[in-house]
Amino acid sequence: MTTVQNLGGPCIELKHSLPSEVAAISPSVDKVMLLIRECGCVADGETDVEIALREALANAVIHGNHQNPRKNVHIRCCCKPDEVTIAVKDEGRGFDINKVADPTAPENTGSVHGRGIYLMKAFMDEVHFEEGGVVVRMRKSSSQAAKKDSLK
C-alpha cells in the first residue's frame, strides 16, 4: 500500500509498505525515487539516496524480517524543498549497531556481505538507528542547501 500526501507545509510525504521479499525491493525503490525526482529536493544526490534506500530495504527484508512472508517493511519519505528524509522500519527484533563489524577492517574486506550500513552512512548526510535497530532514519540535503548553509 502506498499513500502520498501534501502535509500543507513544505513536506510531501510518501508512506509505503512492502512484503518481506527481495523481489519487492526494486519496485518500492522506484516508487520512492519517482517522488524524489518529481519534487526535485535532492536533484544532485538522487543516486546516493537510491543506493542508501536499496541497502536499508535489503537489510530490513533480509536481516530484520528474515524474509518472513507474514512481516512487512514500512517506508516513510518526506520531501522538502532542499532535503529528503527517509525512515525504513522492519518488524524484526532489532540489532545493536555497536556489534556490526567494520567492513573496512582487513579481516572483513573479502566478505561479500556487511557493507549496507557503511554505504548508507557514506551516501547520506545523516543515518540514525532507532527503536532498538528496527528503524533506520536517513537524511540527505541538496548540495545547493549545503552551500547556502555554509554562507550563513
Where are the language model's segments positioned?
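Conserved beta-strand-loop-beta-strand hairpin that lines the nucleotide-binding pocket
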Residues: 1-15, 61-152
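STAS-typified acidic loop motif
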Residues: 14-27
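Two-component histidine phosphotransfer core
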Residues: 26-30, 128
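Alpha-helical macromolecular-interaction surfaces
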Residues: 27, 48-51, 83, 122
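Conserved short strand/loop->alpha-helix "switch" segment adjacent to the catalytic nucleotide/phosphoryl-transfer site
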Residues: 30-54, 109-110
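Short alpha-helix lining the ATP-binding pocket of the histidine-kinase-like ATPase
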Residues: 54, 58, 62
